[in-house]
């Protein structure tokens, strides 16, 4: 069977500006995959950087994979689809990842999938409609409300109408804006103000009064459509869904730490799990996730951000792509990321069994420290993202270590202590303390 993995990118790519390191390397992971599944032929059609598929920066490629690189000038949907078709694949799989400032790569991958399906090539990728629903937070909100899923109450703010008098000088009174403020006043405090099209929690504001909400919306920072929602209180979780055409696996959830504003931050949060305590009504949650998967007709990998508040599960966001927890779930299941992608496509069988794992952040590390970290016997993998042109400290990047794969939570916490002792110069107290708090949350429930 010939399998094509495809990966796209909408941003300008310049080698050397962003440095992505994965340990084990993509090359070694491809080699291990081929050794385990010699019956498969692997092709990667990609625009750089090809996150998770290619060792960007060192230009080392596995001899067990054929790479087809797509230049920016040839990156139209039709051209990429043609390049995939030229490989004569038995199946094509979208390997979609996140981008800034807009988390929209699943939309392009869905358009490519539409072309491939028209050419009778089996393709694992979410539909265009699904990708658009997940990309736009307001459309997500509408979908959830219309289908009776628990989500926060909110008010949509259309930016052009909110400032309609700027382009229509005849307007003396902006009725739309007054209506927005009237609706916001009916929401329960505190509130979170979201960019409807932004990545994750970037650009969000948490406010504790209606006056603060009004101030944010009237400020220069408000330069696009916004969604103002009630800011629900409770622990934060993530869960993933794998499969297609009604055949889905819903994982156990992982619990997430939050920042000082109560938001999950990709660069700062700690993940720990699985969470199975009876208090959290996991069977009910999984049934709702299956209902979600079937309504969206998911195809491949998807991730859902959740909150457990007032003894109920609430959906915060849906990501129609590989997420920041996908590798951690692969570790929990005892398989590689590539095997998880194949499993989500229905190509290989895996018996889902979840061991305790943790995803912990470190500051940027040198090569020696990265390798030392990766060589710990309980470490599944280490990733580092470095922005070499960062202008602010918070933009320089981070390292993350995924470790554990243990039968008991205590064993993972023992592993954490080893890391704290071995890498005391680099272990930041906020992450260590957050990990301890998450463990207590799991143990106490």
Q: Which stretches of residues belong to each language-model region?
A:
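Conserved hydrophobic "DFG−1" position in protein kinase catalytic cores
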Residues: 206, 241-243, 306-308
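Peripheral (often C-terminal) accessory segments that flank ATP-dependent C-N-forming ligase machineries
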Residues: 340-445
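A short glycine-rich, hydrophobically flanked beta-strand micro-motif that places a catalytic Asp/Glu
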Residues: 299-310
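ATP-dependent carboxylate/phosphate-activation module, predominantly the ATP-grasp catalytic core
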Residues: 211, 230-296, 319-345
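ATP-binding N-terminal substructure of ATP-dependent carboxylate-amine bond-forming enzymes
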Residues: 1-123, 163-165, 422-432
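Active-site nucleotide/adenylate-binding loops and adjacent lid/helix of ATP-dependent enzymes
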Residues: 4, 133-227, 233, 245, ...
């Amino acid at each position: 069977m010939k399998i094509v993995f495809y990966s796209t990118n909408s941003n300008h790519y310049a080698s050397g500006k962003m440095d992505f390191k994965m340990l084990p390397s993509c090359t070694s992971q491809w080699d291990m995959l081929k050794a385990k599944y010699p019956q498969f032929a692997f092709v990667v059609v990609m625009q750089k950087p090809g996150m998770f598929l290619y060792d960007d920066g060192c230009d080392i490629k596995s001899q067990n994979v054929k790479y087809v690189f797509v230049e920016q000038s040839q990156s139209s949907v039709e051209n990429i689809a043609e390049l995939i078709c030229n490989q004569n694949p038995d199946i094509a799989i979208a390997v979609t990842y996140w981008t800034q400032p807009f988390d929209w790569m699943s939309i392009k991958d869905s358009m490519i999938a539409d072309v491939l399906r028209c050419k009778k090539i089996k393709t694992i990728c979410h539909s265009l409609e699904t990708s658009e629903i997940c990309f736009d937070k307001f459309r997500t909100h509408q979908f959830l409300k219309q289908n009776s899923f628990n989500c926060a109450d909110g008010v949509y703010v259309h930016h052009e109408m909110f400032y309609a008098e700027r382009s229509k000088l005849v307007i003396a009174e902006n009725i739309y804006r007054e209506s927005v403020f009237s609706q916001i006043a009916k929401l329960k405090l505190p509130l979170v103000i979201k960019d409807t099209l932004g990545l994750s929690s970037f650009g969000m504001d948490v406010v504790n009064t209606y006056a603060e909400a009004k101030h944010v919306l009237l400020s220069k920072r408000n330069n696009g459509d916004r969604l103002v929602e009630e800011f629900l209180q409770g622990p934060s979780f993530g869960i993933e869904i794998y499969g297609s055409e009604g055949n889905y696996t819903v994982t156990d959830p992982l619990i997430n730490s939050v920042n000082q504003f109560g938001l999950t931050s990709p660069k700062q949060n700690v993940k720990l799990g699985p969470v199975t305590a009876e208090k959290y009504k996991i069977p009910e949650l999984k049934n709702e996730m299956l209902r979600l998967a079937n309504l969206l007709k998911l195809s491949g990998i998807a991730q859902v951000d959740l909150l457990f508040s007032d003894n109920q599960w609430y959906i915060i966001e849906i990501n129609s792509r590989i997420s920041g927890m996908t590798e951690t779930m692969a570790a929990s299941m005892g398989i590689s990321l590539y095997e998880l992608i194949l499993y989500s496509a229905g190509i290989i069988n895996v018996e889902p069994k979840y061991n305790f794992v943790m995803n912990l952040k470190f500051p940027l590390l040198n090569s020696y420290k990265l390798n030392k970290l990766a060589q710990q016997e309980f470490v599944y993998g280490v990733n580092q993202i470095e922005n070499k042109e960062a202008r602010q400290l918070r933009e320089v990047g981070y390292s993350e270590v995924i470790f554990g794969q243990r039968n008991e939570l205590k064993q993972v916490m023992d592993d954490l202590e080893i890391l704290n002792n071995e890498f005391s110069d680099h272990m930041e107290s906020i992450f260590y303390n957050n990990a301890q708090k998450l463990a207590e949350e799991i143990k106490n429930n």
